Amino acid sequence: MAKIKITWVKSAIGYKFDQAATIKALGFKKLNQSVIQDDSAAIRGMILKVRHLVVLEEVT
């Protein structure tokens, strides 16, 4: 399965609670942290929800 690298670049303060919960569900603990996740429909849906807070890169 393909992998994607997600970097959290903007704070979730001031946004709805469910967006902060999505950031935590993606595995982030600190701002500017990067995580590598499987490229699945569930992960893509979470990224879509917080696309204004994260940067996405494909890992080859």
From Swiss-Prot:
GO terms for molecular function: structural constituent of ribosome. GO terms for cellular component: large ribosomal subunit. It holds the Pfam family Ribosomal_L30. Gene3D superfamilies: Ribosomal protein L30, ferredoxin-like fold domain (3.30.1390.20). GO terms for biological process: translation. It comes from the Bacteria. Keywords: Ribonucleoprotein, Ribosomal protein. The keyword Ribosomal protein applies. The keyword NAD does not apply. SUPFAM superfamilies: Ribosomal protein L30p/L7e. Belongs to the universal ribosomal protein uL30 family. Part of the 50S ribosomal subunit. This is Large ribosomal subunit protein uL30. The gene is rpmD.
